[in-house]
Amino acid sequence: MEVKAIHKSARISAQKTRLVADQIRGLPIARALNILNFSPKKAAFIVKKVVESAMANAEHNKGADIDELKVSTIIVDKGTSLKRFTARAKGRGNQIEKQTCHITVTLSN
């Protein structure tokens, strides 16, 4: 049995989120949540919410036992960039891209 949870357009770059995702891929749920709880990174908080959402989906929709689940796959894809401008000298402006990403977590037995 596989259960998914997806967070689209998370306001953090995919590169930073992949660092956290690589730490919990393939781990049991309890160990993955423990690692995410004690990680100081902003991405850890966002990934933890997606993992908890997948757990709730498994319990509510499939009636699964949470203790048996593990993080089978976690995929972080690049999302759309928010384009902003910052003021520069002599009346010019430079473009800044604020990165987003899509996080997909799949839990299985």
UniProtKB/Swiss-Prot annotation:
GO MF terms held by the record: rRNA binding; structural constituent of ribosome
UniProt keyword list: Ribonucleoprotein, Ribosomal protein, RNA-binding, rRNA-binding
InterPro entries: Ribosomal_uL22 (IPR001063), Ribosomal_uL22_bac/chlpt-type (IPR005727), Ribosomal_uL22_bac/org-type (IPR047867), Ribosomal_uL22_CS (IPR018260), Ribosomal_uL22_sf (IPR036394)
GO cellular component: cytosolic large ribosomal subunit
One GO biological process term: translation
Reported function: This protein binds specifically to 23S rRNA; its binding is stimulated by other ribosomal proteins, e.g. L4, L17, and L20. It is important during the early stages of 50S assembly. It makes multiple contacts with different domains of the 23S rRNA in the assembled 50S subunit and ribosome. The globular domain of the protein is located near the polypeptide exit tunnel on the outside of the subunit, while an extended beta-hairpin is found that lines the wall of the exit tunnel in the center of the 70S ribosome.
SUBUNIT field: Part of the 50S ribosomal subunit.
Family: Belongs to the universal ribosomal protein uL22 family.
Protein's name according to its UniProt entry: Large ribosomal subunit protein uL22
Origin organism lineage: Bacteria, Pseudomonadati, Pseudomonadota, Betaproteobacteria, Burkholderiales
Name of the encoding gene: rplV
